[in-house]
């Protein structure tokens, strides 16, 4: 076997290396000193480092949540007490017992969808027995007496 050839291209030429070092010294790149930071405060706060937003290995919500309150669950039944009848006649207002979780906007939307009527405003209260009562005031172009007849209250 013949002796292994020595690769001369990998080793840098000493003359070229010296010229490169001399050029660096002349330009001042090799010996630039970093200015020392003067600390004026006694306490040292560690600098903030990069915090990447964490992403989980799997989604925490498996499925989209379904709407637990639909229009039929919001309005339970209309009240037919004597005071409720007086509200229908005098104030153009219908009185409903509604789900405890329903808010005024949901009640308004449910009345609009189920009975095709526009509401002016909705007042709610929670009764001592734990149920929610809603006073639904109708707009002047709807008559509460006619709507009550259509629903079957009267």
Curated annotation (Swiss-Prot):
It holds the Pfam family Ribosomal_L23eN. Transmembrane segments: none annotated. The keyword NAD does not apply. GO terms for cellular component: cytosolic large ribosomal subunit; cytosolic ribosome; Golgi apparatus; nucleolus; plant-type cell wall; plasmodesma. It comes from the Eukaryota. Keywords: Ribonucleoprotein, Ribosomal protein, RNA-binding, rRNA-binding. GO terms for biological process: response to cold; response to high light intensity; response to oxidative stress; translation. InterPro entries: Nucleotide-bd_a/b_plait_sf (IPR012677), Ribosomal_uL23 (IPR019985), Ribosomal_uL23-like (IPR013025), Ribosomal_uL23/eL15/eS24_sf (IPR012678), Ribosomal_uL23_CS (IPR001014), Ribosomal_uL23_N (IPR005633). GO terms for molecular function: mRNA binding; rRNA binding; structural constituent of ribosome. HAMAP family: Ribosomal_uL23_A (MF_01369_A). Belongs to the universal ribosomal protein uL23 family. Binds to a specific region on the 26S rRNA. This is Large ribosomal subunit protein uL23z.
